[in-house]
Amino acid sequence: MLVYQDLLTGDELLSDSFPYKEIHNGMLWEVEGKWVIQGAVNVDIGANPSAEGGEEDEGVDDQAVKVVDIVDTFRLQEQPAFDKKQFVTFMKRYIKNLTPKLDAEKQELFKKHIEGATKFLLSKLSDLQFFVGESMHDDGCLVFAYYKDGATDPTFLYFAYGLKEIKC
């Protein structure tokens, strides 16, 4: 199994259990999330109250919760939305922090293509939800989620060059 960690913080953000598609010259990974029901365990203990003349089984009140699989699995923490100025400030700081961590070849590609990916994200800014890894570190990678037209499940966007592949 492969796990993808934030290159700057070490937070686990994704695994190969969630297939991705590269977009914007490989700068972003697009991953489909799914809403899932967590909790609501149906336990059959073998009792049959109706056959024994007892009352109808009322069960247990176990709180079923609807969560997004990626957010739940990697304990992503939702952040308040950014306005354009905040987002541009974040991107400048992120590029400054990430670039030295990349090898020379990746630095060239990153510098060449990150502007296009940033413009793409800016065009969707009002539709994006923002997440960070479990440590909630300020300098960490942001993970973005949005809903494509007509979709009921969110699509997540990751900065590909901000992820480090770890074999488990």
Swiss-Prot record:
Cellular localisation: Cytoplasm
Gene coding for it: TCTP
TCTP domain location: 1-168
Naturally occurring in which organism (per UniProt): Elaeis guineensis var. tenera
Pfam families: TCTP
Taxonomic classification: Eukaryota, Viridiplantae, Streptophyta, Embryophyta, Tracheophyta
Keywords, in A-Z order: Calcium, Cytoplasm
InterPro entries given in the database record: Mss4-like_sf (IPR011057), Mss4/transl-control_tumour (IPR011323), TCTP (IPR034737), Translation_control_tumour_CS (IPR018103), Translational_control_tumour_p (IPR018105)
Origin superkingdom: Eukaryota
CC per GO annotation: cytoplasm
Similarity comment: Belongs to the TCTP family.
Function: Involved in calcium binding and microtubule stabilization.
This protein's name: Translationally-controlled tumor protein homolog
